[in-house]
A protein has these predicted regions:
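C-terminal regulatory
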Residues: 1-107, 133-134
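Short hydrophobic/aromatic beta-strand micro-patches
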Residues: 110
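Short amphipathic alpha-helical coupling segments at ligand-binding clamshell hinges
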Residues: 116-130
């Protein structure tokens, strides 16, 4: 396997656009279930909720898309990738005082060493590198 870093995925706190920022900050945290608790974004949510004595919603999900839809539906707030959430008018960013992100993760592309020189693999890798957030 050949690995190369292709970008950075930044995360911030979002809630449904139908909620005011003030109300959204009172919503419980929607997070991942125990099978996904190892993810940095899940650990950040848990640590923040514990530190600030905030509630975690009864619903816990094992899929990032389901987490996004739960936030859009108004079930709570969550940490979402900015590259996805900023482009969705159904969401409102309610993160911290600064306009940046609260968590960043490196995005890596893994390619089988014997296949990486195939035209279709090279084309796909080049496309991923072009669209990956930096």
């Amino acid at each position: 396997m050949v690995a190369r870093r292709v970008g950075i995925v930044r995360y911030d706190v979002y809630a449904s656009a139908s909620c005011s920022v003030r109300d959204a900050k009172m919503l419980p945290w929607v997070t991942y279930d125990e099978a996904m608790a190892h993810l940095p974004q899940a650990r950040w949510i848990t640590a923040t909720a514990v530190r600030d004595h905030q509630r975690i919603a009864a619903v816990r999900l094992n899929d990032a898309e389901a987490l996004l839809e739960a936030v859009i539906a108004g079930l709570g707030r969550s940490l979402l990738p900015c590259v996805v959430a900023d482009g969705d008018s159904r969401l409102r960013r309610i993160g911290g005082k600064r306009r940046g992100s609260v968590l960043s993760r490196e995005l890596w592309l893994l390619t089988h060493s014997e296949l990486r020189r195939l035209g279709r693999i090279e084309a796909a890798a080049k496309w991923i590198e072009q669209i990956a957030p930096h």
